[in-house]
Amino acid sequence: MRHWRRKAMLATLPVIRDKSVRTPWREFWRRFLRQHVAVAAGLFVLLLIAIAFWAQYLMPYDAENYFDYDRLNEGPSSAHWLGVDSLGRDIFSRILMGTRISLAAGIFSVLVGMMIGTTLGLLAGYYEGWADRIIMRICDVLFAFPGILLAIAVVAIMGSGMANVVVAVAIFSIPAFARLVRGNTLVLKQLTYIESARSMGANDWTILFRHILPGSVSSIVVFFSMRIGMSIITAASLSFLGLGAQPPMPEWGAMLNEARSDMVIAPHVAIFPSLAIFLTVLAFNLLGDGLRDALDPKLKS
């Protein structure tokens, strides 16, 4: 009888369920997965990265050394899904291989610019004074030139080639990251936990890279993802002008340059590389918008 009453009493009590702890990482994924457009863009970017890694295994033909002289400038067919160009090369294979070249140029150039610009921004924002004035005046000079003109000037001095294109695009990415990180540093260094770290004897480098830099990571990640699209366009523009990738390298901008003379009789030769550039840049921009809204929901509201 006593056990029956105890069970009845326990049955009336509310059940306390174990709730999962809400971490910043889980909150980020929860907000990001609600944005279907950004998720689709992220999946497309992952697909592009997979293509870039395994392009040589996905190509039906050699991108540089295969020539089908019987089907010059022929449109899409079962043998050549996106057609062939004026030299008989398979456009689909060249676009797949061009994915590796364009993504590498865009990502590595922004990565170099991010590393240098972030370091300069931390130093300028933390120390201020003469260091801030010198770094920001150099950034102002670089900002005075349009990005594409600055890249053209750098490549004209250093010479053509994709390696020099990466350097040129990285140079005009440096001031953008420096100004972004400097603004964050000016705000973060005034917070209480920075003063606490300084009072406990932490040196400047520890404060910069262990306390201030993590507070700027979200802004850097968002800007990094959105900057890649601009870098891909700039690299393609330089290749289109003959200053970047050189034939027979299947870079998207170089493919557009080669297609200029055949656009009337074979428009597909220019349409598909242009579409590849458009979709790639759009995907990175949409992904950047989604990351921004997920990392800082206050901006969205």
UniProtKB/Swiss-Prot annotation:
<feature type="domain" description="ABC transmembrane type-1">
    <location>
        <begin position="99"/>
        <end position="288"/>
    </location>
</feature>
<keyword id="KW-0472">Membrane</keyword>
<comment type="subunit">
    <text>The complex is composed of two ATP-binding proteins (GsiA), two transmembrane proteins (GsiC and GsiD) and a solute-binding protein (GsiB).</text>
</comment>
<feature type="transmembrane region" description="Helical">
    <location>
        <begin position="103"/>
        <end position="123"/>
    </location>
</feature>
<keyword id="KW-0813">Transport</keyword>
<dbReference type="GO" id="GO:0071916">
    <property type="term" value="F:dipeptide transmembrane transporter activity"/>
</dbReference>
<comment type="similarity">
    <text>Belongs to the binding-protein-dependent transport system permease family.</text>
</comment>
<keyword id="KW-0812">Transmembrane</keyword>
<feature type="transmembrane region" description="Helical">
    <location>
        <begin position="37"/>
        <end position="57"/>
    </location>
</feature>
<dbReference type="InterPro" id="IPR050366">
    <property type="entry name" value="BP-dependent_transpt_permease"/>
</dbReference>
<feature type="transmembrane region" description="Helical">
    <location>
        <begin position="264"/>
        <end position="284"/>
    </location>
</feature>
<comment type="function">
    <text>Part of the ABC transporter complex GsiABCD involved in glutathione import. Probably responsible for the translocation of the substrate across the membrane.</text>
</comment>
<keyword id="KW-0997">Cell inner membrane</keyword>
<feature type="transmembrane region" description="Helical">
    <location>
        <begin position="220"/>
        <end position="240"/>
    </location>
</feature>
<dbReference type="InterPro" id="IPR035906">
    <property type="entry name" value="MetI-like_sf"/>
</dbReference>
<dbReference type="Pfam" id="PF00528">
    <property type="entry name" value="BPD_transp_1"/>
</dbReference>
<protein>
    <recommendedName>
        <fullName>Glutathione transport system permease protein GsiD</fullName>
    </recommendedName>
</protein>
<dbReference type="GO" id="GO:0005886">
    <property type="term" value="C:plasma membrane"/>
</dbReference>
<dbReference type="InterPro" id="IPR000515">
    <property type="entry name" value="MetI-like"/>
</dbReference>
<feature type="transmembrane region" description="Helical">
    <location>
        <begin position="162"/>
        <end position="182"/>
    </location>
</feature>
<dbReference type="Pfam" id="PF12911">
    <property type="entry name" value="OppC_N"/>
</dbReference>
<keyword id="KW-1133">Transmembrane helix</keyword>
<feature type="transmembrane region" description="Helical">
    <location>
        <begin position="141"/>
        <end position="161"/>
    </location>
</feature>
<dbReference type="InterPro" id="IPR025966">
    <property type="entry name" value="OppC_N"/>
</dbReference>
<keyword id="KW-1003">Cell membrane</keyword>
